[in-house]
Amino acid sequence: MNLSPIILPSNQFDHFYRGGYRIGELRNGPGGPMRPEEWIGSATTRFGEKTMGLSKLPNGEFLRDAIDADPESWFGPEHVSAFGTSTEILVKLLDPDQRLPVHYHPNKAFAKKHLALDHGKTEAWIILEAPADAKVGLGFAQTMKKDVVHDMVKRMDSAALLASLTMVPVKPGDAILVPAGTPHAIEAGIFVLELQEPTDLSALLEWEGFAVDGIKDGHLGLGFDTVLDALRFDPISAAEQKELIKSTGFTSKQSQSLFTSKADGYFRADLLPGDGSKTSAGFSILLMLDGDGILKTTNSGSIAVGHGDALVIPWSAGDWSLNGGVGIVCRPPLPAAAALAP
């Protein structure tokens, strides 16, 4: 059965940090003050929750249930053969009105061993808006020891934890891959489109000033002594940093990949300037950033799209193109690339 692209309703919900007004404005959602994230085209739940985080279709059905009922129409045979009914991707909008806490995410091996999950949480940020002189924390600035970090966590030494990070300047159009295990933080006011593995796995190194009990909920139920084994203690070298960061400035007049090739095993994202260039058939999530256009498919007709629309595009809709407007398309990895990802 050939399915059609679907414009998704907003999927904002409460979180432990402040923000969300820009998401509400872009996506016609509820906005802030404590809804700093929207999960777009999500078949992933919040950690420990049954349905929170799941996207709904306009008819009220969970996207996850629609996929489970007909995975091949949504994904195509190659994806289903490699990944089953997993979307292999989670797409979010992040709009923090306060600095995110220093935190990190486990990799696949740790998640498999300790949580019986098939995915860790390598993620990447596409900077949509940022204040002048905005920065993100990306890895420790020098090699740390587990007991030293654990002591900072026990003492709730937020200043020391933040000072321990390498701070990287960012601007709109930058894209940063954040490998699992990397300690990181995002400053207030940076509006981000995030792609990640389809889990909600975060370990907190600090939580003062946030609406979360880190002693209870900051370690994935494993205890800090265990969860700290998922943390990368050595710094990201200058050479490695170049492999993680790409800057396009959103200026291309042609379709352009936004990430470095290091991201290929986890997810893909392309800027679509509305020039009508073809995107190959496959499960896709499209966020319209500017203007109005027509999304044309080979199998399922056309649909009008506009600023702030978010769509899920099934494989069975066929090849497609965006004619007018500007958007970012987010896609899961190709199976061959995913097989090589650590």
Feature annotation, model-predicted:
Residues 266-273:
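A surface-exposed beta-alpha-beta supersecondary segment
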Residues 1-145, 208-247, 269, 335-336:
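Transition-metal
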